[in-house]
Amino acid sequence: MQKKSATAGRAQRTEESRRRILEATLELAAEKGYEGTAIAQVAKRSGLPVGSVYWHFENKDKLFAALLQHSLDEWEGRQDWLFRSEEPPSRQLEKMISGRTFEAAEATNFWRLGLLLALERRLSGSAAREMFLEIRRSRLDLISGWWQQALPPEVTSHDPGFPLRLAQFTMAAADGLYVSTSAGEDWDATALTGMLVDSIWHLVRQAALQAGVRYDPDLTEN
């Protein structure tokens, strides 16, 4: 019994150390970026020995890859913008585009870090960059599937590639809104979200007309 209790205690301390390391890394990454963050700084910020950081994570690249996955899991746990059948597509799309923009800064630091990694071609092949790109590919598939369900079947039959293009456009709109409003300038994020959503629905209605059907995104079923 005592042996089991001791084992459970070690596991709890190990998980707590890992959490502290990841939290410290996220804080430093928000301040200094990937290149400016060092393992020694992470150890100091977390209050743990450098050896403890290396025990959990082989190197900085793998540490950042684990950070991105951990942060994504936490962020997704707070999201409810996909596949809620009681809400019309118009409301779901609005949440998809504006979700990151209206969250607290600490909740979206990993998106900022991920975008910086994606833009940094010198890091091509690194575990952290590849992790974020895989996250984006997975999210693109998820949103493409959402569009596949939201669109009338006549539209997808008429243009099978339309859901994927809409998913790419949706992600581009969300990225652009997030980057623009994160720059610290006085941009009206709410108004811009509405304009982006209206633009996308205009494209959808045009595609529906070409397919010979009518479509209303404010209805849960069409």
Set out the residue ranges of the language-model regions.
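Short, intrinsically disordered or compositionally biased N-terminal tails of bacterial proteins
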Residues: 1-4
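Short Lys/Arg-rich basic patches
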Residues: 6-11
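Generic hydrophobic, amphipathic alpha-helix propensity
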Residues: 14-25, 42, 67-75, 143
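Helix-turn-helix
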Residues: 20, 24-62, 66
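Short coil/turn segments at alpha/beta junctions that flank glycine-rich nucleotide-binding fingerprints
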Residues: 31-35, 85-86, 107
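Amphipathic alpha-helical packing segments from all-alpha helical-bundle domains
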Residues: 73-81, 91-95, 106-109, 126-153, ...
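Helix-loop "lid/cap" segments that line or gate small-molecule binding pockets
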Residues: 82, 98-105, 114-123
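Hydrophobic alpha-helical bundle segments that form small-molecule/ligand-binding pockets
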Residues: 86-87, 125-126, 137-166, 170, ...
